[in-house]
């Protein structure tokens, strides 16, 4: 019988041609996430301690992308996480990694589900390639 040879994920070079992906891309390509961090990184290590409020300290990047909450906070976690990943692998993504972190934190700390939903919609548009970076 043939034994499959495991492959090692390779990190993406942000200077390669433009790359963005919606939540579904990242959920279907966990090896790329693993290649970025080398482990299933908890969201609190990326977004800071306030990211633990709705989901707890142990929520990982893949879990944030796959969360099924239908409110603004659930959408913020899905789309914000995808935006963070996109900003890390594509230097042409409309937001820098710091801008994603700041906007995510502001929406989360507002305590307003409507603000979280509005920010999630903007992240979703960016993830789908419908937002152009303003220089």
How would you name each of these model-derived features?
Residues 60-62:
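Short, structural beta-strand-to-alpha-helix junction motif
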Residues 85-89, 108:
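Sec/Tat-exported extracytoplasmic proteins
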Residues 13-15, 58, 71, 102, ...:
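Acidic-enriched, low-complexity/disordered segments with a strong bias for Aspartate over Glutamate
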Residues 93-135:
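Alpha-helical bundle/repeat cores within regulatory domains of eukaryotic proteins
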Residues 1-58, 123, 129-135:
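Plant P/S/T-rich low-complexity glycomodules
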Residues 64-77, 87:
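Mature extracytoplasmic domains of secretory-pathway proteins
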